[in-house]
A protein has these predicted regions:
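Mid/C-terminal beta-alpha module of Rossmann-like enzyme folds, strongest
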Residues: 24-87, 119, 128-161
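Acidic/polar helix N-cap motif
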Residues: 27, 98-99
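A conserved pocket-lining segment of Rossmann-fold NAD(P)-dependent short-chain dehydrogenase/reductase
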Residues: 1-13, 24-25, 30, 37
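Short C-terminal domain-edge/linker segments immediately following a structured domain
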Residues: 2-8, 32-34, 66-70, 94-97, ...
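Conserved loop-to-helix N-cap of the C-terminal "lid" that shapes the substrate pocket in Rossmann-like
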Residues: 6, 11-19, 35, 43-47, ...
Length: 161
């Protein structure tokens, strides 16, 4: 289940890339007085993120159902806490980070999203002592709203900071 249409753009960063960039900033005299963005250069839609998660886990890509955020909230969903659906952040207009300054001044080379996600998933598998998820709420949403899918729209243009 994706809130709204799932076309919201999101831009991630692999934690190892943040650490590497921070070390380069500390070691570079040229970095003094500058701010740098750490991010993957490619923004992804929510649909793409779910697809990449399925690939990283080596499972069949799930069928995605888009349900408007207000209906998820009316049914008892919450953007922060149990029954979390991507949080408020994921409904905002896309804000993407420009990383060319870090690339140019510090030779920043972000890890490919799929590569970083696969490595993160492997680590997750090593430490997954989490309880089995309860999908009762999702099943109820699908029964009530699952067929009401809005027509797909292209994502809004990102705002670069």
């Amino acid at each position: 289940i994706l809130p709204s249409e799932g076309h919201r753009l999101m831009q991630f960063v692999y934690v190892d890339d943040v650490v590497k960039l921070a070390i380069r900033v500390l070691e570079s005299r040229n970095a003094v007085g500058h701010a740098f963005n750490a991010a993957n250069p490619r923004a992804l839609t929510q649909h793409e993120v779910v697809s990449e998660l399925a690939k990283a886990a080596n499972v069949k890509e799930p069928a995605l159902v888009s349900i408007p955020r207000d209906r998820i909230l009316q049914a008892g969903g919450s953007p922060f806490g149990p029954k979390l659906y991507f949080g408020y952040y994921f409904d905002l207009p896309a804000i993407t980070q420009v990383i060319t300054k870090a690339q140019r001044m510090l030779a920043f080379k972000p890890t490919d999203f799929a590569v970083g996600l696969k490595a993160t998933y492997k680590e997750y598998l090593k430490h997954r002592g989490f309880p089995k998820p309860d999908f009762t709420f999702e099943d109820e949403l699908l029964a009530k709203y699952g067929r009401e899918m809005p027509p797909p729209r292209p994502p809004k243009a990102p705002v670069h900071l």
